[in-house]
Amino acid sequence: MAVVTMKQLLDSGAHFGHQTRRWNPKMKRFIFTDRNGIYIIDLQQTLTYIDKAYEFVKETVAHGGTVLFVGTKKQAQESIAAEATRVGMPYVNQRWLGGMLTNFSTVHKRLQRLKELEAMEQTGGFEGRTKKEILMLTREMNKLERTLGGIRDMQKVPSAIWVVDTNKEHIAVGEARKLNIPVIAILDTNCDPDLVDYPIPGNDDAIRSAALLTKVVASAVAEGVQARAGLASGDAKPEAGAGEPLAEWEQELLAQANPNAEGSAEAAPAAATEEAPAAQTPADF
């Protein structure tokens, strides 16, 4: 069964690119035509590239890897957080802090500080302090939660990153490339395909399009988790030595995917068809 259908892509508005005066010539091969001054993306190619990206993500997770979901623009924030949380992956949907990948040791110290402050609050560590001190500590904790909450359990740099809007997230993409971390991303008509390892030509401005493609990547992660556990029939098994004990969230995911499974080997169902929205032209940023 197809990972996603042409109708789903059309309904989400994934075929709408930017205005013809705002494009990257390197994207020419992904453009089908232009309509009323708007480029139309070739969705047949999109389907092909989705399959390639899906397979890569599934195999990466099956062999113990993690995928960092990145999307800080308003249109992507909700779906990035929801889908990453659904499959237990780290995410950044507020502000990307410079060095989040290339200087992860420092970022990890800030994560430890966040957990320290949360523990203080929960165990009464704020008691006996002045109102001003409590206010300062609370503000610090809230700020850390807002910027780092999505990666609080990330112990090392990810195996790959999923990006919505490579232009807006150019710092994240640049850091990933410095560390040779594969980049999977939506490629709108104003993006540079040379910066992405696994491109998916599509609309990165429409909420429905970003949500649909993020859901596809999350579904690939979910299938990779099942393959890692050896439950997905016909999928390649993890290499010897890669089979770490499943995390609690992974066990819950497997239980949800196989509610009647006592040795069941059924693959996870394909992503549910989304409600068909009216086609819309994305805002030109």
From Swiss-Prot:
Highest taxon, organism lineage: Bacteria
MF annotations from Gene Ontology: structural constituent of ribosome
Keyword Cell division found: no
InterPro entries hit by this protein: Ribosomal_uS2, Ribosomal_uS2_bac/mit/plastid, Ribosomal_uS2_CS, Ribosomal_uS2_flav_dom_sf
Positions with biased composition (Low complexity): 257-285
CDD domains assigned to the protein according to its UniProt record, in alphabetical order: RPS2
Chain segments carrying region Disordered: 229-285
Any single biological process term in GO: translation
GO cellular component terms, A-Z: cytosolic small ribosomal subunit
Keywords: Ribonucleoprotein, Ribosomal protein
NCBIfam families linked: rpsB_bact (TIGR01011)
PANTHER family (alphabetical): 30S RIBOSOMAL PROTEIN S2 PROKARYOTIC AND ORGANELLAR, SMALL RIBOSOMAL SUBUNIT PROTEIN US2M
Family affiliation: Belongs to the universal ribosomal protein uS2 family.
Protein name: Small ribosomal subunit protein uS2
Species in which this protein is naturally found: Nocardia farcinica (strain IFM 10152)
Lineage per the UniProt record: Bacteria, Bacillati, Actinomycetota, Actinomycetes, Mycobacteriales
Primary gene name: rpsB
